[in-house]
Amino acid sequence: MLNEFIAIRRDLHQIPETGYKELKTQAYLLAYISKLPNKHLEVKKWRTGILVLVKGTKPEKTIGYRTDIDALPITEETGLPFESNHVGNMHACGHDLHMSIALGVLTHFASKPAKDNLLFVFQPAEEGPGGAKPIMESEEFAAWRPDTIYGLHIAPEYKVGEIAIKPGLLFANTSELFISFKGKGGHAAYPHLANDMVVAASAFVGQMQTIISRNIDPMDSAVITIGRIHGGEIQNVIAETAFLDGTIRTLSPETMEIVWTRLKQLAKGWEEAYQCEVEFHPGSDYYQVDNEPLETEEFIRFLKEHYPESYVPARSAMTGEDFGYFLSEIKGFMFWLGVDSEYSLHHAKLNPKEEAIPFAIDVLINFLESK
């Protein structure tokens, strides 16, 4: 018999929706939650997200658990019988697993409340434009603001049954990068009468990397990645405009500030050198996931005692996750959950092993009951 929450994961996998468009997802989650014993439950909607409070038997504090619910604009290539019904969208970052795990934990505590209050946060728009900060600033969240908060993220590189975590910095600071170049177009036969923005943008890509190699302390770490370049429309016309889309990832907010300062300085020089306009366009920012040491060490001790084969010391990663905004104000942690997939996060063929779902539910229930 298929595990109930694996079946739920497959349902959710078929209806992936991007940030703040998670209407079917929200409706599915609400329909499921409405069937749970409701004596101890209170439910609030926030935009396309949901907050569920499970009232404790003798509450002294509120413990939060957050899951993200959105998908990515990726065309799925898994060939699974339950692949995406929304062509062009895919749960390629495991949020379908995240949701099914959260529902599994919620289901248990709806019937068997813990001593303290539990707040389940079903957060939209993690992949962009970023839902953590806005939901934290909402009246709905403020009314039930937790004293601690936890979360997880699937990890294809770890085996099922493994949990990787570390105190301190787990995920990097991340900023989306969108740059436009505007010059003067013209006929390919008369380059001296135009300002070629393909040339300007291409040169800028290379020059950006000197920020990493020459402006960042070599004992620190930062990455600038340009994932998309677009310029011009026709092969025999010099491009009047060009666009660069990418990301910046750093291990500290201070290093992020250095990168941005140097980028803007370079842009001013480019405007002079290439007789063009260079403009930066706003994107999403993700604050570092910095695990609170005492909370994290408590979880590690729990794993070593109850799941001794599961604990794996994690390394800091350049991954971006807006759960960091929660941890910037509320103590807690995030951990990697092994799902043993040959394809990486954000890959069109990502196929996590579903056995990780009941395992994670079991770990979280036992940990929360131990609090």
UniProtKB/Swiss-Prot annotation:
Keywords: Amino-acid biosynthesis, Diaminopimelate biosynthesis, Hydrolase, Lysine biosynthesis
Name the UniProt record assigns to this protein: N-acetyldiaminopimelate deacetylase
Taxonomic lineage: Bacteria, Bacillati, Bacillota, Bacilli, Bacillales
GO biological process: diaminopimelate biosynthetic process; lysine biosynthetic process via diaminopimelate
Coiled coil ranges: none
Enzyme's top EC category: hydrolase
Primary role: Catalyzes the conversion of N-acetyl-diaminopimelate to diaminopimelate and acetate.
Lineage: superkingdom: Bacteria
Molecular-function GO terms, alphabetical: N-acetyldiaminopimelate deacetylase activity
Pfam families found in the cross-reference section: M20_dimer, Peptidase_M20
Pathway assigned to this chain's UniProt record: Amino-acid biosynthesis; L-lysine biosynthesis via DAP pathway; LL-2,6-diaminopimelate from (S)-tetrahydrodipicolinate (acetylase route): step 3/3
Catalytic residues of the enzyme: D68, E127
Family in the record: Belongs to the peptidase M20A family. N-acetyldiaminopimelate deacetylase subfamily.
Keyword Disulfide bond among UniProt keywords: no
DNA-binding listed as a keyword: no
